[in-house]
Amino acid sequence: MTAINRRQFLLITTASILTACSNSKKSTQIAKGDTVVALGDSLTAGHGANIAYPTVLQELTGWQVINHGVSGDTSADVLNRLPETLSLNPKLVLFGIGGNDFLRKVAENETKQNIIATIQQMKNKGISVLLIAEPHFTVSALFGRFQDHPMYEEIARQENIPLASDLWSDILSDNSLKSDQIHANDAGYRQFAEKLAQFLKQQGLL
């Protein structure tokens, strides 16, 4: 290996190590009693059931989990009501939105930009954000197995935040866990909260 090639190799290797370190940043643990907001749509609100996942998550974590889910909300709606969420001064926001955008055929780039703008405003306030992927609701998916929309992975990577993937897709693909084609039942919301709690532990947030 020539001196120039060796130098190039060392520069590339060093850059790779630095990138890996920045991407594996340890999350700050949220203490019991701290305020956490669940921000989203009907899947957060608990439509179709007697319980919602934030209620179960509060039992599992000891956090004060505030449910800011509104049935029918799109990414634009959540962005518009974000000041109310920020006024609660949460340590962490569990953010899941997009399903209604898909159903209403909102342009993907518009949805993506709304989600990014919401995340950036929260981060600018020093709030930790965990993004929750939602299924890509299509006609074929409604009668088969759901899959996450790929944009969530892109957003999480771009904003360097953790992504809880496949949770809703798995639950809504199981008829025993849902109340209709796009909403969970009591068992489904409870299972979501339990799996989310496991993921939060893996991320060092719990």
Annotate the PLM regions:
Residues S22-N89:
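Serine-esterase "nucleophile elbow" of acetyl-processing enzymes
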